[in-house]
Amino acid sequence: MAKLEQYFDYVKINLASPERIRKWGERTLPNGQIVGEVTKPETINYRTLKPEMDGLFCERIFGPVKDWECHCGKYKRVRYKGIICERCGVEVAESKVRRHRMGHIELAAPVTHVWYLKSLPSYISILLDIPLKDVEQIVYFNSYIVTRPGNCPNLRYKQLLSEDEWIEIEDQLYQEDSNLYGVEVGIGAEAIQKLLKDVDLEVEAESLREDVLSAKGSKRDKAIKRLRVIDNFIATRSDPAWMILTVLPVIPPDLRPMVQLDGGRFATSDLNDLYRRVLNRNNRLIRLQEILAPEIIIRNEKRMLQESVDALIDNGRRGRTVVGANNRPLKSLSDIIEGKQGRFRQNLLGKRVDYSGRSVIVVGPTLQLNQCGLPREMALELFQPFVIHKLIHQGLVNNIKAAKKMIQKNDSVIWSVLEEVIQGHPVLLNRAPTLHRLGIQAFEPILVEGRAIKLHPLVCPAFNADFDGDQMAVHIPLSLEAQAEARLLMLAPYNFLSPATGEPIIMPSQDMVLGCYYLTTHNPSQQKSQAYYFSNLEDALLAYECKKIALHSYVWVRFEGEVEDENLKIRTSILKEKYTLDIFTERIIKTDEEKKVIAQYILTTPGRILLNKTLFDSLTLSN
């Protein structure tokens, strides 16, 4: 098989037509035979342990089990590459083709796709404008639906009929003197398919647009909902009838393997059991139709086929959940795709990548907003190629091997080189689940001791992170373009507003709010060293650092700035030399005879001084 490299911009998931599903699995052999249809529920032969032909593991459909060897053994070795065996019809190829070659099952009766029937909103229900409950009654053979009312006055288009009502109309229809004609009713997925084929999307969309303009309330909302679905069908050029399956795709056998265990027993994927149920019921329905079995038996078999396809696509979505050994529910196609352990989140979005690391986050209150603390050990591993290049460039070593040896020895030179390397090289921090674009942001790394990543507390709301054991991933942008994009677009200070609401997302929370409250709170209990006087704010902080006063001790501090005048005046004292002392509850002002302020003391705590100084320093620094 030729290896092709195909570049693409995006992947679009769309409804598949029956022709496309056949095209996925069908191949034409040199003798003109078309292979691809799985017709037998058998998997492997119990004596030879080789896959059964036309079964779920058929080598003719899916490719050989052994590299460069056909089923019958006539052709072995790579020199026969591409040859199709005349005896068994198997193409000589690598066994890994069994990971992507598909097959298909031709269904004896159409069945509805359970995603489009039972998911909310139900697209089949919306498109036909029939309540979901009624659609289910039709699909599972409990009620008939009128597809052509003919000239019967008691019938209308899309009217539901019970078994007894239809028998009564049928008796009138086939009477010798009956004037009724053109009456058609249906049941099951075939009836839904006929109704969907009758829907003219363009005409329906035009009619709904008029309804949206004229209608009000719930009727208008319903029209908008239908119009949105119809417009999407028109835009994607999908036929609504494709929501009814006539051909069922069979996924490649290596994605649903059967593995032999030590004791000779086999472990198999649940999908094989679900496919086997579909094939058994499909083959039984074909036989019943061939022998012209009674309608009631055929209808029951069609219902069972519908239920088996439902279980294959989404087990448990409707009806009783199909269980295997030990009453364990079988994993359907939907179970493999969806959820945290599903194919998308586990294997595609969550795959391991180079130049990345992961560790627990801890708070880094001393960091700048655009910085993160990166453990030395992790940083050395992530930036190792850059460090090696720098060591060779500076002439400290001659080759890569010597550089790696120096790194392993933990030479002291390494850390200074690492400091140079990370200077101006942003890193990306990501916290799963990345539900919005702020779940991954760029920071400038600072080397820290220990094994935990240090994160600025202000960016926690954007990541929805807290410090109770959360982990974050680190990624290194390698190219200059990636580094420039990280620096210009993804740096934390540039992601100030929430993309959802437009409101600031960088806001103090949790520990920061509690810390600010603790620093500024009134503490009525007796603290040590109350009512000291200090000549400036720095002296008060120095006394606190020397443990002469407590964080919440009330002290008088000389302050030259403006103070809000909300204090209650207690008394005024006249001092010698004509000075006046105005005493307030939290302030003392000394003035001369011209009322000019000579000195002002305020009552405060070291905690409040500390908060005020921190805010003042950060504001003056930013300016």
UniProtKB/Swiss-Prot annotation:
Subcellular location: Plastid, Chloroplast
Listed Pfam families: RNA_pol_Rpb1_1, RNA_pol_Rpb1_2, RNA_pol_Rpb1_3
GO MF assignments: DNA binding; DNA-directed RNA polymerase activity; magnesium ion binding; zinc ion binding
Top-level taxonomic group: Eukaryota
Cofactor binding summary note: Binds 1 Mg(2+) ion per subunit.
Protein keywords: Chloroplast, DNA-directed RNA polymerase, Magnesium, Metal-binding, Nucleotidyltransferase, Plastid, Transcription, Transferase, Zinc
Main location: plastid
Gene Ontology cellular-component terms listed: chloroplast; DNA-directed RNA polymerase complex; mitochondrion
Binding site for Mg(2+): D466, D468, D470
Ranges annotated as spanning the membrane: none
Binding residues for Zn(2+): C70, C72, C85, C88
Any GO BP: DNA-templated transcription
SUPFAM superfamilies registered for this protein in UniProt: beta and beta-prime subunits of DNA dependent RNA-polymerase (SSF64484)
Catalyses which reaction(s): RNA(n) + a ribonucleoside 5'-triphosphate = RNA(n+1) + diphosphate
Names of the cofactor(s): Mg(2+); Zn(2+)
UniProt EC number: 2.7.7.6
Assembly with partners or alone: In plastids the minimal PEP RNA polymerase catalytic core is composed of four subunits: alpha, beta, beta', and beta''. When a (nuclear-encoded) sigma factor is associated with the core the holoenzyme is formed, which can initiate transcription.
Function statement: DNA-dependent RNA polymerase catalyzes the transcription of DNA into RNA using the four ribonucleoside triphosphates as substrates.
Listed PANTHER family: DNA-DIRECTED RNA POLYMERASE, DNA-DIRECTED RNA POLYMERASE SUBUNIT BETA
The family this protein is said to belong to: Belongs to the RNA polymerase beta' chain family. RpoC1 subfamily.
Protein name, entry field: DNA-directed RNA polymerase subunit beta'
Annotated organism of origin: Rhodomonas salina
